[in-house]
Amino acid sequence: MNQPPKPNSFRSGPDEEGRFGIFGGRFVAETLMPLILDLQDEWARAKNDPAFKAELENLGTHYIGRPSPLYFAERLTAELGGAKIYFKREELNHTGSHKINNCIGQILLAKRMGKTRIIAETGAGQHGVASATVAARFGLPCVVYMGATDVERQAPNVFRMKLLGAEVKPVTAGNGTLKDAMNEALRDWVTNVDSTYYLIGTAAGPHPYPEMVRDFQAVIGEEAKQQILEAEGRLPDLVVAAVGGGSNAIGIFHSFLDDEGVRIVGVEAGGKGLDGDEHCASLTAGSPGVLHGNRTYLLQDGDGQIKEGHSISAGLDYPGIGPEHAWLNDIGRVEYVPIMDHEALEAFQTLTRLEGIIPALEPSHALAEVIKRAPKMGKDEIILMNLSGRGDKDIFTVGKILGMGQ
């Protein structure tokens, strides 16, 4: 797992209460508090247990396919004419994204706690697929809550989950997206607290989830750091990742937070523009509040009602962000910027045609920012981007927009 942080480190959070500065914490129903505290105790034991680490590492190697490669995007670099661009190829993992890293870790915890049923929420369906996958691997029943809107736009992943034996429950409340799915999952958890483990897919939710998810995803940055040192003999100048709830981003960022020479940029979903409500840029255009068990930046109105965000990418369509990102934003260690739907779409097509890699729409947002920045950087500079998921799930969405048909 992680190397111990240095004193005065950006990597030492959260505190015992699960706070990163004023963000994080655990704001949950009384019925859930004993379970949350049990989970926290089990997590504290597990992360110091050599047998747990060994099992996690073994599954990482033989089931997920780690380490994922670091790939020099030669043609994209030449086309942009600036910094060298490297991708951390998380889309090559089993199930096609970074989500499996966290799911394997959490299902091992669920087994340790004696839980007999798994529930999960999903937006793009990648976390749902990864949850259904690990539930099948360990022989546990799995229920996945998914917004009705997302069920429609992510049909291939819905079919995958069902094939894997999971029950997919469409949620029609609100806009029928990730926030609404998470609300339903929390309701289920309160009702079935003794038997059920809630496998949260992003670095948000009540403590210890943000810390736990980050630590399971930190393998991305740990590997990438070693790989870039082997490839280039030095660290990158810039690390970039897309941010929805923020698990793939914190996974690659965490290892680099204490490296002063490394600039770090998180890319939010700018949707149709920040002047209206059709975006999901919580840090750029939101304000602090409490949602889903933690204090963080949210898209909310003057009365504290959560707004319904929008993104072309189902995985970024969440009106909040993990609390560690909120803190990193406020202290200025990480810069967060929005990318619009149309920019992500262009980046999606660029990568597909230049490198023969079809990216998911989520990392296409990060790629759009890389495409903007690379030409302004020197040819001796290095950009590292997390290519967090593959785009198979998005081909129909993109085809529809581009008028390609089936």
Curated annotation (Swiss-Prot):
Obligatory cofactor(s): pyridoxal 5'-phosphate
Amino-acid biosynthesis listed as a keyword: yes
Catalytic activity: (1S,2R)-1-C-(indol-3-yl)glycerol 3-phosphate + L-serine = D-glyceraldehyde 3-phosphate + L-tryptophan + H2O
PROSITE patterns assigned: TRP_SYNTHASE_BETA
Keyword presence, Amino-acid biosynthesis: yes
Modified residues (N6-(pyridoxal phosphate)lysine): K99
Pathway in which the depicted protein is active: Amino-acid biosynthesis; L-tryptophan biosynthesis; L-tryptophan from chorismate: step 5/5
Top-level EC class: lyase
Keyword annotations of the record: Amino-acid biosynthesis, Aromatic amino acid biosynthesis, Lyase, Pyridoxal phosphate, Tryptophan biosynthesis
Taxonomy, superkingdom: Bacteria
InterPro entries associated with the record: Trp_synth_b_CS (IPR006653), Trp_synth_beta (IPR006654), Trp_synth_beta/beta-like (IPR023026), TrpB-like_PALP (IPR001926), TrpB-like_PALP_sf (IPR036052)
UniProt-listed SUPFAM superfamilies: Tryptophan synthase beta subunit-like PLP-dependent enzymes (SSF53686)
Entry's Gene Ontology cellular component terms: cytoplasm
EC number, UniProt record: 4.2.1.20
A molecular function GO annotation: tryptophan synthase activity
Function: The beta subunit is responsible for the synthesis of L-tryptophan from indole and L-serine.
Family designation: Belongs to the TrpB family.
Subunit structure comment from the entry: Tetramer of two alpha and two beta chains.
Protein name, entry field: Tryptophan synthase beta chain
Annotated source species: Rhizobium meliloti (strain 1021) (Ensifer meliloti)
